[in-house]
Design a protein with these regions (language model features):
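Fe-S-dependent hydro-lyases/dehydratases of central metabolism
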Residues: 1-200
Length: 200
């Protein structure tokens, strides 16, 4: 969102100098997913908890959400997923990552440069994804190159079968703990073996 505030400010500066502010747009498809703005004031036992919490969220973020609504029509190449639709990494995985892009008769692999620490989740789909800071994201939006270090690829063989009462979450947490102890950071992981086959 901060990047779009900066672009709006750039439009104002260009207009002040007599230029055409409508020419300031991201040159690559840009998606703004509004998440993590919901404060839970009503508990899960209240059947209307979601609606009540969303109403509070809308009231507290009225100016912010108004600006975000404006960006949907003011800028080209901007797609907005409003609040109340889920969290960024879930939306990226389920709705926003086509894996293969197709434009002007050319097909090419999708990439994702995002400011959320969970951006790399889309790597699971074969989308090359990196998390960056806000300024680097703005550079990408304006057509500047982003350096992507190709990470090491590490195979993780899962053996055995999942036992009754053990959830996929239990396995993920145990794997995360193990990989941290082994100092596996910044690598692509490929899971294979009979244990991986039994997960799906």
């Amino acid at each position: 969102q901060t990047a779009l505030v900066d672009l709006a400010g750039l439009r104002d500066a260009i207009a002040d100098q007599g230029g055409d502010p409508s020419k300031v747009n991201p040159v690559v498809p840009t998606q703004l997913i509004v998440d993590h703005s919901l404060a839970v004031e009503f508990g899960g036992f209240d059947p209307d908890a979601f609606e009540k919490n969303r109403a509070i969220e809308d009231r507290r973020n009225e100016d912010r959400f108004h600006f975000i609504e404006w960006t949907k029509t003011a800028f080209e190449n901007v797609d907005v997923i409003p609040a109340g639709n889920g969290i960024m990494h879930q939306i990226n995985l389920e709705k926003m990552s086509p894996v293969v892009q197709s434009r002007e008769g050319l097909a090419f692999p999708d990439t994702c440069v995002g400011t959320d620490s969970h951006t790399p989740h889309t790597d699971a789909l074969g989308v090359i994804s990196i998390g960056v800071g806000g300024l680097e994201a703005e550079n990408v939006m304006l057509g500047r190159a982003s350096w992507m270090r190709l990470p090491d690829i590490i195979g993780v063989e899962l053996v055995g079968q999942r036992q009754a009462g053990i959830t996929a979450t239990d396995i993920v947490l145990a794997l995360t703990e193990f990989l941290r102890k082994e100092r596996v950071v910044g690598a692509y992981l490929e899971f294979f073996g009979e244990g991986a086959d039994s997960m799906s």
